[in-house]
Amino acid sequence: MIITKAKPFAEVLQSLEGEKTVFLVGCSECATVCKTGGEEEVKQMKARLEQEGKTVSGWVVLDPGCNLLEAKKEFRKAKEEIGQADSLLVMSCGGGAQIAQEASGKIVHPANNTLFLGTVERFGHFKEYCSMCGECILDLTGGICPATRCPKGLLNGPCGGAKDGKCEVNPDNDCVWIEIYDRLKEIGKLKEFLASPVHVHDYSVNTNPSTLVLERDKARSDNR
């Protein structure tokens, strides 16, 4: 899940300076769970903007906000309302904001800051467990990711700065390498890990921007 945090309303207003009419775009998935762009938040944003003298020509909650085909379909339905707007205020992640721009051709303003790929611990509580590095080593580290959960991104063991099992950089967090050590010991994989070569990450496997085309779709395109 992509974790987002709503920008301060004053910042949103500043980005809309000089624009009278806006169309709102939400997301039914990640932004809904994060309470930054579901139907409830879109309606609240509409009311707040109208209180500030803005005209909201319409709104839509895409399912999801990062699907280009879905965005094009819904934008066609709202063609008139979008045409009346000076810009779109997009209440999803950065990917969704860029999809909205591509699908509409309009100026877009992000209402949220995109933070990380997160897991849901409980309602309203999210944690970053994966950095989408493109070279997963969870099978080697007991299902715990050092690349993400170590602030220094160390892949060859702890830095030596941990104190009482806590991270040197953020003492509120447990040292992930101590967690990995304990987990590998628990599942009987510690000796195997210590005897294996140090993993060297290949940063070339995940360069920006990335693209993935599923083989069946690639074959279909090649046959056209």
Task: Give the location of each predicted region.
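Iron-sulfur (Fe-S) cluster-binding modules
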Residues: 1-63, 75-88, 102-140, 144-224
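ATP-dependent adenylate-handling ligase core
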Residues: 66-68
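N-terminal glycine-rich "phosphate-gripper" loop used for MgATP/nucleotide binding
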Residues: 90-94
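Short, well-ordered alpha-helical microsegments
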Residues: 96-98
